[in-house]
């Protein structure tokens, strides 16, 4: 990946984990954005706590960087219980999951990131654990092997995924609470940027926070990452204060434009417009054209372009919309303006 793709990638960098942890809100009262999720959890969590019960199992899904891990920490904090954290790829054998489950305290939260990547044999162990609070484990080998049931304490499983469609129906149906995280509105990102600036002890003008928020692709993780790079620029090239002008210059230096697009976003859009005449084009063809992996396009680049209306999915493949043409100052091709898109621009 290029430097600026790293800057606007919603994927978490290993070096960011400690910084991100210090910036995460610990309580629902400090949680910004996702109003529907917040409103629901403000009912479910106190209800479970008042009854001294484990919260129902929670599935959180949405694009990377929107706060799935943060929300899991908040759930544990609000329930005043321990959080045990792991990920789907780490749980290679049923015994790995059994070890975690049998060491939980009553009402603890077990957080499994990338839960769609659980192996089928591990997932089979999870079903009775979620539903009946029991697991079956094998003791011994060969003819002497036998299965025994272990009772588990009440617990809450919080599963997070960017690919909810890859979850099996039996697993998905066992979650009593399902929360979808959406891209953040600019005004919510401004609040997040201002909060982070206060924690980092930065001097920032409102317009500076707005400029960073506008270019953050609706993603808090990207907003915080860009803020730290703007701080570097302000301290070296300015007086340390983040103004709108300072933010603009810093983000232009990082090649992040006013829409939050970086080189790879523009490369993908231009490939659709110039090499494939606006589409429709398959993802594999796009991946080959821009030298990127299919998974990166589907999970990292494409979601924001779809949400912003620059790309649309059709049964025949991806198509560029009129927004994409206008962004590059090109005249939309007639065949590239389907009726449902054309109706949005009656005066053009």
UniProtKB/Swiss-Prot annotation:
The keyword Transcription does not apply. One of its GO terms (biological process) is DNA recombination. This is Holliday junction branch migration complex subunit RuvB. It is found in: Cytoplasm. Has 3 domains, the large (RuvB-L) and small ATPase (RuvB-S) domains and the C-terminal head (RuvB-H) domain. The head domain binds DNA, while the ATPase domains jointly bind ATP, ADP or are empty depending on the state of the subunit in the translocation cycle. During a single DNA translocation step the structure of each domain remains the same, but their relative positions change. DNA binds at residues 294, 313, 318. The gene is ruvB. Its EC number is 3.6.4.-.
